[in-house]
Amino acid sequence: MKRILLKLSGEALAGEKHTGFDEATVTVVAKQVKQLVDAGTEVGIVIGGGNFWRGRTSETIDRTKADQIGMLATVMNCIYVSEIFRSVGMKTAVLTPFECGSMTKLFSKDRANKYFAHSMVVFFAGGTGHPYFSTDTATVLRAVEIEADEILLAKAIDGVYDSDPKTNPNAKKYDEISIQEVIDKKLAVVDLTASIMCMENKMPMYVFGLNEENSIVKALNGEINGTRVTV
C-alpha cells in the first residue's frame, strides 16, 4: 500500500477568484483524491494559506504574529476542504500541532497512522506550529514523520524550470532533477530548509501542474509531464 503527502497551494483552492475558496476547484481535487483512496492509497494533505494571508509581504506586523496568522489560515483551509471531501464520500481528519478546541485533533504520528488505517484522508494543518517555518517545511516534516513514500507537489506551473517560465519564454523544464541540483541552482521548488530536509531524509518529490485534467491521479501513476525530484 502506498502512502503519499499531497501539498496544495492556497491560491490553487481559490481558482480564478485568487482569494477565499472556489468550491468547483476544490470539488475537482476531492474527486481525484477519492479515486486514490478507493484504489487503496493512503493520502495526507498539507494546504498553504496564501488564499487568505501572505505574512511576509507585510511591513507593519511582527513576523511571529504574521506567521501565526498564516498558520490559522491553513487551519481554515483544511477544515473547509475536509468538508468538501466528506461531501463526495470520504472520511477525513484534521490534525494541528497546537490545540484548536474541538475543531481539530492534536497531531501525533500514532494518531495519524490510526486514521490512515481506517482509510481516512488526513489533513495536516497549522504548519509546524512555529513561526519562521513555511508550509513547504511543514510538508516535508509531516511526510518524513508519517513515512510517506513520496510528496506530490501540486503547483500553478507544470514542473521545475531553470528560470521563471512566466517571465522567460525560453525557460528549460526538467523532466528529472536531484534535490542537490535544486539546492545548488537555487531553483526554489521548495524553500531551502525543506530542500535540505528532503535530501537528508531521502524524501522524493513529484512536481506537477494542478490545472491539468485528472492531474493528481496522473501524477501518482507517473502519467503526467511533471518533474521528478530525486534524492
What annotation goes with each model-predicted range?
Residues 1-231:
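C-terminal catalytic "cap/lid" subdomain
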